[in-house]
Design a protein with these regions (language model features):
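A nucleotide-sugar donor-handling region in carbohydrate enzymes
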Residues: 121, 126-182
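Intrinsically disordered, low-complexity regions enriched in small/polar residues
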Residues: 6-7, 45, 156, 173
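Active-site and donor-binding regions of nucleotide-sugar-utilizing enzymes
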Residues: 17, 21-37, 42-146
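Extreme N-terminal starter segment of soluble prokaryotic enzymes
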Residues: 10-15
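N-terminal amphipathic/basic-hydrophobic helices that include classical n-h-c signal peptides
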Residues: 1-9
Length: 182
C-alpha cells in the first residue's frame, strides 16, 4: 500500500540517511524494497557526517532539544551542523536509528520532503515525520505506526529461495537484542 503523501506518477527517488550502523541501513533498505514492490523507485544511501565531529555527543542532546520546537530556523541550525546533503531531487527521505532522527525531521521540514523514520523517538515527537515506525506505541499522533516485524532488506521471498539450498542439520540460534527497534 502506497502512503497517501507520495506522488507515484513518476519514478520516485528515495534518500536514505545513514548513521553508518549496518542494522539501521538494512532497515531503511527494507522500507525501500517494500515501496519498490508497489511503485517504480530507486534509492541512494547518504552517510551523515558532523561538521564538528569532536562535539557530536553534546550536539546530539542539543539537536534533540531543538526538535521540541522545530521550525524553519531551528531546522536550519540542525542541518547546518552536518556536512551538506543534496536533497533537491528526492521525493522521500527514509532513516533509521536515533542518530538520524533530528536531521531527518529538519531536512523534511526545510525542503518539504515526506519522511519516514524507524526507531524509538528518544524525545522527538512523531508529528515531525510523515511516518514514524516504532515497535510500540509512543505517541498518539497518527504518523506513529506500530509494527510487529522490523523491516529489513531480506524479503520473505528471498529467504524462501535461499532455504531451497539449505540442508537441515543440528543448529542453535542465539538472538541478542537491545532496547532499540531491532
Amino acid at each position: 500500500m502506497i502512503p497517501y503523501f507520495l506522488n507515484i506518477e513518476n519514478a520516485m527517488r528515495i534518500l536514505i540517511l545513514s548513521d553508518g550502523i549496518p542494522g539501521h541501513v538494512n532497515q531503511s533498505i527494507g522500507i525501500c524494497h517494500m515501496l519498490q514492490g508497489e511503485t517504480n523507485c530507486t534509492f541512494e544511501v547518504h552517510e551523515l557526517a558532523w561538521k564538528l565531529h569532536f562535539l557530536r555527543s553534546p550536539l546530539k542532546i542539543f539537536i534533540r532539544f531543538l526538535c521540541s520546537f522545530l521550525n524553519t530556523f531551528t531546522a536550519n541550525l540542525i542541518q547546518g551542523l552536518f556536512k551538506p546533503i543534496m536533497v533537491q531531487d528526492f521525493d522521500l527521505i527514509v532513516a533509521a536509528g536515533g542518530n538520524t532522527m533530528a536531521l531527518n525531521a529538519a531536512v523534511g521540514l526545510i525542503h518539504k520532503i515526506p519522511n519516514i523514520q524507524l526507531g524509538s523517538p528518544r524525545g522527538i515527537p512523531s508529528r515531525l515525520f510523515s511516518v514514524h515506525l516504532t515497535s510500540e506505541k509512543f505517541d498518539d499522533h497518527p504518523s506513529n505506526i506500530v509494527f510487529d516485524i522490523t523491516p529489513n532488506k531480506y524479503s520473505p521471498s528471498n529467504c524462501s529461495r535461499a532455504s531451497i539450498n539449505f540442508h537441515p542439520q543440528d543448529f542453535i540460534l542465539l538472538l541478542i537484542g537491545g532496547d532499540g527497534i531491532g
